[in-house]
């Protein structure tokens, strides 16, 4: 299954059993059978006939605005439903102890993967600081406490970014991103979110019920929970690589009066490499076969389901390479 | 089994697939019945092949697919008697498929339809197996239906089977991760 990225404006429509992207000067026809995500970074005209077709073919359509900010997704109607699992999901949210246990696991997984990024670069002092913070995870008594612990860890982590990348960073700024590095993180995190979301929709998990993030957040917050684990591995590593290999330069960013955003050229570089990251394979030690990076997300959702069923405690993906 | 129990079973929405899974793997049966159906999302080539096969095999035959209650039948053949047909991709789980078909026959009989036989088609090996429903089968089937209910009433799925067949199962990743 492939992901398509649309950077040019035009009309996307259904043409018999295929998709046609009609641009001013040409028409491109794409067979639908091997598409599973379409990312749209430009202005598109489309109609409900197209959406109906995409739903039928289980294709997600994600929209980003002119500045590369994530606007939202069209996700096909859920085909997987399990009242049984939903009840368990809610139960694990309502029971404070159960919720905290899961929330801690997400943070624990995220911090492990963050630490691995620093360990490779021999930031021993920050690594031991992260270890200290990690030890505190088990003692947290509330989600707020856990969140603030995580914020501490993230700050220590981000403090190394100027050195790792050689780019200005300051601190994490989201809405809007104040500099190129922040713009890159926001963009990468949004991409990761959509990938997790798509996988959640393929399972019977309900994406609105989450544990670390509040379900009341306007987004499908379970995707935010799970994305925490994968961001350090899929997004952060990619950012370091793109900058260190000089594949992304200052010229790939537009500095608006108030904020910075990735230009079309910059987005193209990023998504191409992101796509390659997702398709990379690695020998899975437990399943004893090669699996794609993106399948790691699906496997973590399986583990989460097993936890919710009460079969086996969830242990998040901890990067081993 | 008395008629009350039979009504009870109907309520439990036992499908033909569930009957087959009962004879294949109780864990698979439990997961499937709870809505944790992984068949649609697995990249497993066998599963996809099976689905495509199921969708296309009899397209050219002019017979309708008939469905009632929880039963789905590929087509019925009217030759004085009604025959249930099922298409399967391999003979690996022949016993399970046979019971699935017998369950359909039983459901038809319950509806007062004159049916006591069917055919399982294996187009990939160009074979067909006739299945006859005997009075003894009825008793065995009742036992199986009760067994299915027992599996489904458990709070947790059965432990994984740990057999060679797991490697080709759509639930493999789920069970072994
Ligand atoms: S992988 Fe094995 S244990 Fe799991 S459902 Fe399939 S057959 Fe059963």
From Swiss-Prot, chain A:
Q: Name one Pfam family in it.
A: Cas_Cas1
Q: Which InterPro entries match?
A: CRISPR-assoc_Cas1, CRISPR-assoc_Cas1_C, CRISPR-assoc_Cas1_HMARI/TNEAP, CRISPR-assoc_Cas1_N
Keyword list, A-Z? Antiviral defense, DNA-binding, Endonuclease, Hydrolase, Magnesium, Manganese, Metal-binding, Nuclease
The protein's required cofactors: Mg(2+); Mn(2+)
- Biological process GO annotation list? defense response to virus; maintenance of CRISPR repeat elements
Q: Which residues bind Mn(2+)?
A: 150, 213, 228
Q: What is its EC number?
A: 3.1.-.-
Which GO terms of the molecular function aspect are on file? DNA binding; DNA endonuclease activity; metal ion binding
Q: Which family does it belong to?
A: Belongs to the CRISPR-associated endonuclease Cas1 family.
Quaternary structure note: Homodimer, forms a heterotetramer with a Cas2 homodimer.
Stated name of the protein = CRISPR-associated endonuclease Cas1 2
In its UniProt entry, the species of origin is given as Moorella thermoacetica (strain ATCC 39073 / JCM 9320)
Q: What is the primary gene name for this protein?
A: cas1-2
């Amino acid at each position: 299954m492939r992901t398509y990225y649309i950077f040019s404006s035009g009309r996307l429509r259904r043409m018999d059993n295929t998709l046609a992207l009609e641009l001013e000067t040409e028409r491109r026809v794409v067979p639908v059978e091997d598409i599973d995500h379409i990312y749209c970074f430009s202005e598109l005209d489309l109609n409900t006939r197209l959406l109906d077709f995409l739903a039928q073919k289980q294709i997600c359509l994600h929209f980003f605005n002119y500045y590369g900010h994530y606007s939202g997704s069209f996700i096909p109607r859920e085909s997987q439903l399990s009242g049984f699992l939903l009840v368990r999901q809610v139960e694990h949210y309502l029971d404070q102890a159960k919720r905290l246990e899961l929330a801690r696991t997400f943070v624990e997984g995220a911090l492990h993967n963050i630490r691995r990024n620093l360990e490779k670069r021999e930031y021993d002092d920050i690594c031991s600081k992260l270890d200290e913070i990690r030890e505190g995870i088990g003692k947290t008594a509330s989600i707020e406490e856990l969140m603030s612990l995580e914020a501490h860890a993230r700050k220590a982590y981000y403090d190394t970014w100027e050195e790792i990348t050689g780019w200005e960073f300051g601190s994490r700024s989201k809405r809007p991103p104040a500099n190129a590095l922040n713009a890159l993180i926001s963009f990468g995190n949004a991409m990761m979110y959509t990938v997790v979301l798509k996988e959640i929709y393929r399972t019977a998990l309900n994406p609105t019920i989450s544990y670390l993030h509040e379900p009341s957040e306007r987004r499908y917050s379970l995707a935010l929970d799970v994305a925490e684990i994968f961001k350090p591995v899929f997004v952060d590593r990619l950012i370091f690589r793109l900058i260190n290999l000089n594949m992304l330069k200052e010229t790939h960013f537009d500095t608006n009066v108030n904020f910075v955003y990735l230009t079309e050229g910059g987005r193209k570089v990023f998504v191409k490499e992101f796509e390659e990251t997702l398709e990379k394979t690695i020998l899975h030690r437990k399943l004893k076969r090669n699996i794609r990076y993106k399948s790691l997300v699906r496997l973590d959702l399986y583990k989460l389901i097993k936890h919710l069923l009460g079969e086996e405690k969830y242990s998040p993906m901890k990067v081993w390479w | 089994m008395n008629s009350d129990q039979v009504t009870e079973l109907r309520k439990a929405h036992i499908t033909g697939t569930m009957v087959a899974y009962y004879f294949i793997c109780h864990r698979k049966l439990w997961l499937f019945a709870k809505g944790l159906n992984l068949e649609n999302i697995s990249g497993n080539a066998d599963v996809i092949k099976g689905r495509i096969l199921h969708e296309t095999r009899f397209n050219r035959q002019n017979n309708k697919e008939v469905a009632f209650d929880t039963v789905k039948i590929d087509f019925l053949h009217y030759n004085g008697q009604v025959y249930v047909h099922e298409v399967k991709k391999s003979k690996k789980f022949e016993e399970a498929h046979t019971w699935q078909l017998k369950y359909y026959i039983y459901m038809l009989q319950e509806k007062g339809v004159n049916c006591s036989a069917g055919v399982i088609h294996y187009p990939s090996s160009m074979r067909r197996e006739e299945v006859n429903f005997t009075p003894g089968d009825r008793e065995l089937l009742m036992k199986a239906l009760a067994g299915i209910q027992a599996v489904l009433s458990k709070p947790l799925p059965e432990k994984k089977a740990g057999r060679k067949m797991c490697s080709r199962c759509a639930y493999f990743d789920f069970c072994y991760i």
